[in-house]
Amino acid sequence: MVFYMYNMMMNLNLLKEMRTNNKLVLNKLVLKNLLYWINKDTFKENMKIYSNYNNNYMNTNLQNKNIKRINNKLYRYMPIQSEWSNKLITKLYITNIKNMNKLLFKNIINNNNNDNFNIINLFNNKYNNNNIMMNLLMFKYLTGWSTQLKGRYTNNMSRTNTTVNKSGTFNNKKYTFIKNNYKLNYISANHNISNLYNVNKNGKYNLKIKLNYI
């Protein structure tokens, strides 16, 4: 009886240990998967697909079904992108621009012996107020994507169908720097812009999906 109880206790301890090890292994796998996507390098690549379509298929199936299918798949990730953009990307972006402004004026003051007249002249000559946001831009952020169908016929006539989808990274917010209002990616969130033309001839078309950045 004692030996039986001892075996039961050993088996229970072994099962607990196996469960603990399984949890640890599972947690490591989950963490590894998360770190892969968090630390994954961002890149952009154009995808090109060449196919022949007749007039009816081009005007109905390809435009109305395939492009919508692509957009629907991409829009699934919009809530995640918006959440991260609003809380993390925007905060980091604004903080870096403020730090750059502090360094900018500090260097101007130090290099001109606190001469206000020289400070103003140096600033006006070196920096253009219209382009200052481009000079302060340090990172590239995804603003959306565009789907383009472009083809050329035997008589040298071309047809291009383009669908542009934009998602505002900074959620349509304005920020003030150096007594001027600058728009940071001032794009309406989840706004669709379509430029579609009816294709009335048969031909070969190139389908290209491009990611748009600022």
Swiss-Prot record:
Pfam families: VAR1 (PF05316). It comes from the Eukaryota. GO terms for biological process: translation. One of its GO terms (molecular function) is structural constituent of ribosome. GO terms for cellular component: mitochondrion; ribonucleoprotein complex; ribosome. Keywords: Mitochondrion, Ribonucleoprotein, Ribosomal protein. It is found in: Mitochondrion. Belongs to the universal ribosomal protein uS3 family. Essential for mitochondrial protein synthesis and required for the maturation of small ribosomal subunits. This is Small ribosomal subunit protein uS3m. The lineage of its organism: Eukaryota, Fungi, Dikarya, Ascomycota, Saccharomycotina. The gene is VAR1.
